[in-house]
From Swiss-Prot:
Gene3D superfamilies in UniProt: Ribosomal protein L33
GO MF annotations in UniProt: structural constituent of ribosome
Name of the protein in its database record: Large ribosomal subunit protein bL33c
InterPro entries xrefs: Ribosomal_bL33, Ribosomal_bL33_CS, Ribosomal_bL33_sf, Ribosomal_zn-bd
Keywords: Chloroplast, Plastid, Ribonucleoprotein, Ribosomal protein
Organism phylogeny: Eukaryota, Viridiplantae, Streptophyta, Embryophyta, Tracheophyta
Similarity annotation: Belongs to the bacterial ribosomal protein bL33 family.
Keyword Ribonucleoprotein: yes
Biological process (GO), any one: translation
Matching PROSITE patterns: RIBOSOMAL_L33
Length: 66
């Protein structure tokens, strides 16, 4: 039997340095990744170091609202 809410949810990770640069129009775009997280194990916002093709380096990507 399945319980009420699923533990796994899809989340979108967005580059934090591209978001800051986009205000000044220095960046060509904003890097985003789609991944899954377990809501029970990580109830807080997810932050991972991923490669950003617009910054050409590994940066911190934070979870955003859908």
């Amino acid at each position: 039997m399945a319980k009420g809410k699923d533990a796994r949810v899809s989340v979108i990770l967005e580059c934090t340095s591209c978001v800051r640069k986009n205000v000044n129009k220095e960046s060509r775009g904003i890097s985003r990744y789609i991944t899954q997280k377990n809501r029970r194990n990580t109830p807080s916002r997810l932050e991972l170091r991923k490669f950003c093709p617009y910054c050409y380096k590994h940066t911190i990507h934070g979870e955003i609202k859908k």
